[in-house]
Amino acid sequence: MSSSILEALEVPLSDLLRRNLAPVDVAILDSGIDATHPMLSGRVVEAFGVTKTDGQDTIVAVAQDTDNDQIGHGTAVGSIIARIAPNARLFDVRVLGADNTCSDEILAAGIRHGTAKGWAVINLSLAAGYRLRGDLEAVCEAAYYRGQALIAARRNIPVGGDGLPAELPSCIGVDLGSYQAPFEFGFLIGSPIELIAGGEGIVVAARGGGFKTVTGTSFATPAISGLCALLLGAFPDLQPYELKSILRSRALIGNQKKA
């Protein structure tokens, strides 16, 4: 066991904010980010859009200081990470369209792009269907072995499962619980979805300015991504399995999931 994880297991998570944290690259695969919002101004390093052009999934770079959001979902998610982890460098990958959906192929293309870029933490506040399970397993496992942490949301309404990639062992799956984000969270025993974080009544940045209140697994997930960014900022050599161990050791005991 490395000295980093031994220290990380002892330090209260809230104390990490008092440290000189290294910058950590955090990708947000979502509806885009409104980088003109005061809460997110200067936080987005690069921005992309993933679309289907002539039958091919195409990844296009866009200006990182503009409104790249389609519906406001990604802006909300990004603001949670930005608030929790001041050391997070945000990378915006827009995969959702104006109808808040995307094809499994576009989502898979976004995940492949994120893992190929080598971003340390990848937040996925969305879920794919099961048709591409084999492809997603291969991509997520490769990222895991490269030391990348993929944090993914459980489906708010499960349809035959918890959703991909959240239920894959190479990811950290997150469900919605009745906790005070971000430093209180639970561990779900006997489930592929490992953590339960506070995602109810969360005040987030609204696209176009101002703030709004949201609820859902989508907003519990970035709380865990933010904590991973804090841990990696303090202990850059931590591996995904060590992040899982640290988070489990700090989780409240029991299946404290909100009904």
Enumerate the predicted regions with their spans.
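Active-site/binding-pocket entry motifs
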Residues: 34, 50-51, 96, 180, ...
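A cross-family glycoside hydrolase active-site/sugar-binding cleft signature
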Residues: 94, 123-127, 151-155, 176, ...
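Mature extracellular/periplasmic domains of secretome proteins
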Residues: 15-21, 101-123, 133-148, 159-175, ...
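Gly/Ser-rich catalytic serine loop of serine hydrolases
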Residues: 66-75, 157-158, 212-224
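Subtilisin-like peptidase catalytic core
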Residues: 60-130, 234-235, 247-251
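Active-site core segment of subtilase-fold serine proteases
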Residues: 2-84, 88
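C-terminal subdomain of the subtilisin-like protease fold in secreted/lumenal serine endopeptidases
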Residues: 1-13, 115, 119-124, 233-259
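Extracellular S/T/G-rich loop segment that most often corresponds to the catalytic His/Ser-adjacent loop
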Residues: 163-233, 237
